Design a protein with these regions (language model features):
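Acidic catalytic loop of the alpha/beta-hydrolase fold
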Residues: 191-195, 222-223
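Short beta-strand/loop motif that positions the catalytic acidic residue
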Residues: 180, 186-188, 192
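Conserved alpha/beta-hydrolase
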Residues: 39, 43-65
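Catalytic nucleophile-loop/oxyanion-hole region of alpha/beta-hydrolase
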Residues: 62-87
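Catalytic histidine-centered segment of alpha/beta-hydrolase-like enzymes
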Residues: 220-232
Length: 243
């Protein structure tokens, strides 16, 4: 697969397919990559419908350059914008999974004219506040003293630096209202134990627009990767294209 080389000479792995517009860009979640079920399902959908499609890996994820702990939300936002500016053609539908949903909103605010619509899959904007609040006091003290901690969650362990927390707070989008006059669809599983089902409502309270939908899936979890979930995602893209 090809790599985009950024201004720091760091490689960002991506895959793109040609087709008609609007294009689709899939943005993976924290500590994930571009090879999951949702990304591959979207690629199949794009091929079937002859649509442009891109999936990529933020630095510190998958086979892109760098160590996870060396990057922040600002860095990953820059990766997405680099893909939009240098690889994508024309208008795009951004599909953001979990953390990718946060990056999706940040990119939409930075490049509004390039975005045809947004689809959040268990979107988790501003999640760092909640993450830090839930950290045990011992871990908070360790981070203050050493500037880095080892964190384990849902079977994964990774290093987190203090700058990750500080930078995340600088990138909050729900601290004030903003207008979005294009389609926004938030898809949320009611059995999600990572991003709670009340998050979509918090999001739409801060985003002002007339084309905003929330789709609650009763039997779906955070992964949103079963056949029913994938069909809902594909149908949502189709509805934005028809719109």
């Amino acid at each position: 697969m090809p790599y985009f080389i950024n201004k720091k000479k760091e490689r960002i792995r991506y895959k793109s397919i040609k087709g008609k517009g609007p294009g689709i860009i899939f943005i993976h979640g924290l500590n994930s990559d571009m090879s999951g079920k949702k990304a591959l399902s979207l690629e199949r959908f794009a091929r079937k419908n002859k649509l442009r499609f891109i999936r990529f890996e933020c630095r510190g994820h998958g086979k892109s350059d760098g160590k996870f702990e060396d990057f922040t939300i600002s860095d990953w936002k820059k990766d997405l914008i680099d893909i939009i500016d240098n690889i994508a053609k024309g208008q795009q539908i951004l599909v953001g999974s979990s953390m990718g949903g946060w990056l999706m909103f940040l990119a939409a605010k930075a490049r509004p004219r390039r975005i045809a619509g947004l689809i959040g899959l268990a979107a988790a904007p501003d999640y760092i506040d909640g993450f830090y609040k839930k950290l045990p006091l011992k871990k908070k003290q360790e981070m203050k003293k050493k500037g880095i901690i080892k964190y384990s969650s849902y079977g994964f362990s990774y290093l987190i630096k203090k700058k990750y927390i500080v930078d995340g707070r600088k990138n909050k989008i729900l601290n004030k209202e903003f207008k979005w006059n294009r389609p926004l669809i938030l898809i949320q599983g009611l059995k999600d134990n990572v991003v709670t089902p009340d998050v979509p409502e918090k999001i739409v309270k801060k985003i002002k627009g007339k084309q905003i939908q929330i789709k609650l899936l009763k039997n779906s979890d955070h992964r949103l990767s079963n056949l029913f979930d994938l069909k809902i995602i594909n149908d949502s893209i189709q509805s934005i294209i028809k719109n």
